[in-house]
Swiss-Prot record:
The modification Phosphothreonine is found at residues 30, 973, 980. It comes from Homo sapiens (Human). Residues 1-119, 173-196, 441-450, 532-554, 599-612, 652-1083 are cytoplasmic. NCBIfam families: 2a30. Residues 12-26 have a biased composition (Basic and acidic residues). This is Solute carrier family 12 member 7. Residues 664-680 are annotated as: Scissor helix. Homodimer; adopts a domain-swap conformation at the scissor helices connecting the transmembrane domain and C-terminal domain. Heterodimer with K-Cl cotransporter SLC12A5. It comes from the Eukaryota. Residues 143-149, 226-249, 301-419, 474-504 are extracellular.
């Protein structure tokens, strides 16, 4: 249940002594006596656990820094100087967030530190190329072109490549939204989607990678048994009940042996797999080059590859050589080997198959070449049912009534019933592998640059290869050869190999090693993915798979991966495993697009991808395309995959560990009702989800109208319609007397909110004092998770005026309240000069003066403002101050690197502030400030004296009148003394009580300024001079707001310091962080 507690003062004193009373009542057991002065919770700047820096180190080092920043010295323990922060943050090396990494020994850690970082080409482009180009290209693409025709094949490839391109765009946006952890794709997805969706998608990704291993192993065995060594088959067609059944049994036996062998290689050492990766990649590249070389050669010198036809039916040439029925030798005829296959004997009089007798045997060129014109014949699809003849269009054929022995004759038959949807499912795995680059994010020099560039270039390259191969295969190869899946009409040779130049063995050997390498890569990556999911602890029953060998190798995860991979191998058919693989990868890609779309639509402040070429409509299109492809491939597989993902989601939701990763899905909870409120109330949001939920404190005039309406304009510009906005105000008095005024004030505020397009809630409090009302608002505004974390208010411009001498007291106490509540504070000075929503700045700068680090609000606010049309054309500049001991050149480089990782575009300038003597102006200004402070106190004492004196005279006059009335009724008693007040006595009594105060006023002109105040004033004057020099013409200046002094006797001096700090600037926003990080470099 949502709970709200409001702290109210025990006893309110007009002179501000209620704070001390409240402190005394909090500790009734404290022994009496003088207490040492302790800062109250609002005086400092309490820090929460920071995702940026180690607070212990900061506290140890802060003693030595900031010697020239006296205005901020009381907060150095919590707010470090910028130079110290940049030194820790800018030169990080791949931090892993959210996962307990295995403790590696010092030697391996030293080796990793020395390992060279990879660039875009080696680190992303080539691995993606190797993973995308694979077994389907070599073993199935020609068959897909033959069955679906060039047009439909082109459509299939275009759909799949478009799907992966859109997914790559979404993935690039996610990958460049902060530092990509070394965990790769799983961490990127899970940290964007949250533990429930992240775990479900992570397991789908794991199962897809595991089944990919099974598919590659089956491809390896198919190449080996069909094209390299057919004689190595253990099961023969006669014993196994048919050639297809024998092939399946052989695949299972050889596949299992290969899986065990590969698993042993992975178990012994992954380094061998990584070393062989370039060799396997070279095989792929050489094979593709051989294909293009063969196409070029076929245009002017086609290879002599005859294909034998009986009628219009294609014959398998595994059992005969000559494509003739009989030979003519010396005027005598002799039957051929083909005759013996179709007849009961080799004699010319033997009984033969009816179709064999009725039709002629012809021979055509299997690869007529690019100039042959065969392209038009291959344009259209030729789908057929299982067991159908592979027939050539346009060749005459005499049909026969009944053919019972067709399967036993040497025809080329279709092994499965083909359809458009089946071909999509079989082909899609050939475009997966786009996340190979992000999986290596820990080894990249600049992951934010390399991942989008390398991945998209790899997809463009492979899409070009696939689409061009479809056109070239259709233009060079005869249709019946394309539809011959296993090359039976080519004497058992690989179709694509016969096209290649200089030799078919280039393709056969190249494809064999490339599929071997891809299988090894899958068996290497899948266990690590499972280990990462297990170590996250979101799926309790998988935690055992998070353990491994002493060097961190995932032994148990490898064992489970091998078992799951074995189930794919037992299926034994590449065409059956591929659609299963497609489902898991499509599910994964769907959620990547969903994550990007959700983050874009939510406009979370942390969503600042460095990759700019994305849009939520592209992500939505990619998500829709993934969903469509899932159901196109197989509707029952699609439903099964979604059911599996849904079950995992619900399991993690109800049984999994509580995780908070700053994901985009959880941001949707702020737009929901009770259920979402209860979910977001569990704790503060993750740094990545932090956005300013603003409580705007408005001042009202005597007619309950808003004094500073442009404060609401600024609020709407800052919020841009997103997040929570509470507009609050306080009326002095009692609610019974002021409820009509309160309603009128609330109507005025709502009307102004509507005019300024500020979407939010209005909350008005009637309180006996302005101070208490503001405190109540800060404590209790909002509900559950919909609570503010930032307070926005206007600077009290009249704090020096005599008609409002104590407005500064409410202001300083409000600063302390926000600090104690861990809330950020924004103070707009000269708020009436801030722009309205209708105005547009055509240029100019938003200048940020980053003096101390208090959570990153200074960087976040300009980014949010620049989303609005008013500030969009303004450029952002960040200034920071270097002191004598700082290396300003290195500071600038570090700050540029830091902003690069924050994905914020800004000009950077480091301003050097040398230590110099305190000027006479600073002394004079400090002296004037302290004299005014003392004078205010003396005036307050004089006012109290006057009030007490007037009350005394009133009492005495009342007493004298009562005595006179009594004398008319009774005689005077002798023991009473009658006092007579003359004018002289009254004046003497009056001025005698003021002697002390007059002497106090005389002392003001002989006092010397306090040295700590002089140093603070020195800082304020120097900073103001530097800011004026650089930012006098800026459209907006953002400054760190120093905290109020721990000694509350100097509150009015604090106001003077802020006044001096911002003097001469047009629009100023003073920013004070809420004690927690609000911006992060992580994705």
């Amino acid at each position: 249940m949502p709970t709200n507690f409001t702290v109210v003062p025990v006893e309110a004193h007009a002179d501000g002594g209620g704070d001390e009373t409240a402190e005394r009542t909090e500790a009734p057991g404290t022994p009496e006596g003088p207490e040492p002065e302790r800062p109250s919770p609002g005086d400092g700047n309490p820090r929460e656990n920071s995702p940026f820096l180690n607070n212990v180190e900061v506290e140890q080092e802060s003693f030595f820094e900031g010697k020239n920043m006296a205005l901020f010295e009381e907060e150095m323990d919590s707010n470090p100087m910028v130079s110290s922060l940049l030194n820790k943050l800018a030169n990080y090396t791949n931090l892993s967030q959210g996962v307990v990494e295995h403790e590696e020994d010092e030697e391996s850690r030293r080796r990793e530190a020395k390992a060279p970082r990879m660039g875009t080409f080696i680190g992303v482009y080539l691995p993606c190329l190797q993973n995308i180009l694979g077994v389907i290209l070599f073993l199935r693409l020609t068959w897909i072109v033959g069955v679906a025709g060039v047009l439909e094949s082109f459509l299939i490839v275009a759909m799949c490549c478009t799907c992966t391109m859109l997914t790559a765009i979404s993935m690039s946006a996610i990958a460049t939204n902060g530092v990509v952890p070394a965990g790769g794709s799983y961490y990127m997805i899970s940290r964007s989607l949250g533990p429930e969706f992240g775990g479900a998608v992570g397991l789908c990704f794991y199962l897809g990678t595991t089944f990919a291993g099974a598919m590659y192993i089956l491809g390896t065995i198919e190449i080996f048994l069909t094209y390299i060594s057919p004689g190595a088959a253990i099961f023969q067609a006669e014993a196994a009940g048919g050639e297809a059944a024998a092939m399946l049994h052989n695949m299972r036996v050889y596949g299992t042996c290969t899986l065990v062998l590969m698993a042993l290689v992975v178990f012994v050492g992954v380094k061998y797999v990584n070393k062989l990766a370039l060799v396997f990649l070279a095989c792929v590249v050489l094979s593709i080059l051989a294909i293009y070389a063969g196409v070029i050669k076929s245009a002017f010198d086609p290879p002599d590859i005859p294909v034998c036809l009986l009628g219009n039916r294609t014959l398998s040439r595994r059992s005969f050589d000559a494509c003739v029925k009989a030979y003519g030798i010396h005027n005598n005829s002799a039957t051929s080997a083909l005759w013996g296959l179709f007849c009961n004997g080799s004699q010319p009089s033997a009984a033969c198959d009816e179709y064999f007798i009725q039709n002629n045997v012809t021979e055509i060129q299997g690869i007529p070449g690019a100039a042959s014109g065969v392209f038009l014949e291959n344009l259209w699809s030729t789908y057929a049912h299982a067991g159908a003849f592979v027939e050539k269009k346009g060749v005459p054929s005499v049909p026969v009534a009944e053919e019972s022995r067709a399967s036993a004759l040497p025809y080329v038959l279709t092994d499965i019933a083909a359809s458009f949807t089946l071909l999509v499912g079989i082909y899609f795995p050939s475009v997966t592998g786009i996340m190979a680059g992000s999986n290596r994010s820990g080894d990249l020099k600049d992951a934010q640059k390399s991942i989008p560039t390398g991945t998209i270039l790899a997809i463009v390259t492979t899409s070009f290869i696939y689409l061009s191969c479809i056109v070239l295969f259709g233009a060079c190869i005869e249709g019946v050869v394309l539809r011959d899946k296993f090359g039976e009409a080519l004497q058992g040779n690989l179709v694509i190999g016969m096209l290649a130049w200089p030799s078919p063995w280039v393709i056969v050997i190249g494809s064999f090693f490339s599929t071997c390498g891809a299988g090894l890569q899958s068996l290497t990556g899948a266990p690590r993915l499972l280990q990462a999911i297990a170590r996250d602890g979101i799926v309790p029953f998988l935690q055992v798979f998070g353990h491994g060998k002493a060097n961190g190798e995932p032994t148990w995860a490898l064992l489970l991966t091998v078992l799951i991979c074995e189930t794919g191998i037992l299926i034994a058919s590449l065409d059956s495993v591929a659609p299963i693989l497609s489902m898991f990868f499509l599910m994964c890609y769907l959620f990547v697009n969903l994550a990007c779309a959700v983050q874009t639509l939510l406009r979370t402040p942390n969503w600042r991808p460095r990759f700019k070429f994305y849009h939520w409509t592209l992500s939505f299109l990619g998500m829709s395309l993934c969903l469509a492809l899932m159901f196109i491939c197989s509707w029952y597989y699609a439903l099964s995959a979604m059911l599996i993902a849904g079950c995992i989601y619900k399991y993690i939701e109800y049984r999994g560990a509580e995780k908070e990763w700053g994901d985009g899905i959880r941001g949707l909870s702020l737009n929901a009702a009770r259920y979402a409120l209860l979910r977001v109330e569990h704790g503060p949001p993750h740094t990545k989800n932090w956005r300013p939920q603003v409580l705007v404190m408005l001042n009202l005039d005597a007619e309950q109208a808003v004094k500073h309406p442009r404060l609401l304009s600024f609020t709407s510009q800052l919020k841009a319609g997103k997040g929570l906005t509470i507009v609050g105000s306080v009326l002095e008095g009692t609610y019974l007397d002021k409820h009509m005024e309160a309603q009128r004030a609330e109507e005025n505020i709502r009307s102004l909110m509507s005019t300024e397009k500020t979407k939010g809630f209005c909350q008005l409090v009637v309180s006996s004092s302005l101070r208490d009302g503001m405190s109540h608002l800060i404590q209790s505004a909002g509900l559950g998770g919909l609570k503010h974390n930032t307070v926005l208010m206007a600077w009290p411009a009249s704090w020096k005026q005599e008609d409002n001498p104590f407005s500064w007291k409410n202001f300083v106490d409000t600063v302390r309240d926000t600090t104690a509540a861990h809330q950020a504070l924004l103070v707009a000075k000269n708020v009436d000069s801030f722009p309205q929503n209708q105005e547009r700045f055509g240029g100019g700068h938003i200048d940020v003066w980053w003096i101390v680090h208090d959570g990153g609000m200074l960087m976040l606010l300009p980014f949010l403002l620049r989303q609005h049309k008013v500030w969009r054309k303004c450029r952002m500049r960040i200034f920071t101050v270097a002191q004598v001991d700082d290396n300003s050149i290195q500071m600038k480089k570090d700050l540029q690197m830091f902003l690069y990782h924050l994905r914020i575009s800004a000009e950077v300038e480091v301003v050097e502030m040398v230590e110099n003597d305190i000027s006479a102006f600073t002394y004079e200004r400090t002296l004037m400030m302290e004299q005014r402070s003392q004078m205010l106190k003396q005036m307050q004492l004089s006012k109290n004296e006057q009030e007490r004196e007037a009350q005394l005279i009133h009492d005495r006059n009342t007493a004298s009148h009562t005595a006179a009335a009594a004398r008319t009724q009774a005689p005077p008693t002798p023991d009473k003394v009658q006092m007579t007040w003359t004018r002289e006595k009254l004046i003497a009594e009056k001025y005698r009580s003021r002697d002390t105060s007059l002497s106090g006023f005389k002392d003001l002109f002989s006092m010397k300024p306090d040295q700590s105040n002089v140093r603070r004033m020195h800082t304020a004057v120097k900073l103001n001079g530097v800011v004026l020099n650089k930012s006098q013409d800026a459209q907006l200046v953002l400054l760190n707001m120093p905290g109020p002094p721990k000694n509350r006797q100097g509150d009015e001096n604090y106001m003077e310091f802020l006044e001096v700090l911002t003097e001469g600037l047009n629009r100023v926003l003073l920013v004070r962080g809420g004690g927690r990080e609000v911006i992060t470099i992580y994705s």
